[in-house]
């Protein structure tokens, strides 16, 4: 179908030409329940929580992942919110056919045809995925300097004893 919000879709890279696909995805709202049998979590009481847990990623990135799983041959470019009710959130995901000649022959879009961009949505490389990884520019994103939270933590917690020369 055509994008519900053509202005937003175009800002995110959509073009009304062959090779571009729009998928509307419905995601159930709310937090994430820990999938354990009868609420039986073992270990210390601090880890006994089952119900009021929050998923680390946004519902928008979940929608992108589901669209990417469903359309394995397409590449997820971006996505945007289109609506919500009490139970669901609705997102539209922009997908690109990497083998379409309109995409492959255009210098502006042929970057997504390269194999390194397979399943960007699974690896947190889309805009929505990067948000939950804490990546960005400026003083608000100092905790991911070095590529990721873990890389920044590792560098700051590694003791280096330089040999005296």
From Swiss-Prot:
Matches recorded under PROSITE patterns: RIBOSOMAL_L15E
GO MF entries: RNA binding; structural constituent of ribosome
InterPro entries recorded: Rbsml_eL15_core_dom_sf, Ribosomal_eL15, Ribosomal_eL15_CS, Ribosomal_uL23/eL15/eS24_sf
Pfam families listed in its UniProt record: Ribosomal_L15e (PF00827)
GO cellular component: cytosolic large ribosomal subunit
Entry keyword annotation includes Ribonucleoprotein: yes
Alphabetical keyword list: Cytoplasm, Ribonucleoprotein, Ribosomal protein
Region Disordered, annotated ranges: 126-147
Annotated disulfide bonds: none
Biological-process GO terms, alphabetical: cytoplasmic translation
Ranges of Basic residues composition bias in the record: 130-143
Record's subcellular location: Cytoplasm
Role summary: Component of the large ribosomal subunit. The ribosome is a large ribonucleoprotein complex responsible for the synthesis of proteins in the cell.
Subunit structure: Component of the large ribosomal subunit.
Family statement: Belongs to the eukaryotic ribosomal protein eL15 family.
Protein name per the record: Large ribosomal subunit protein eL15
Name of the coding gene: RPL15
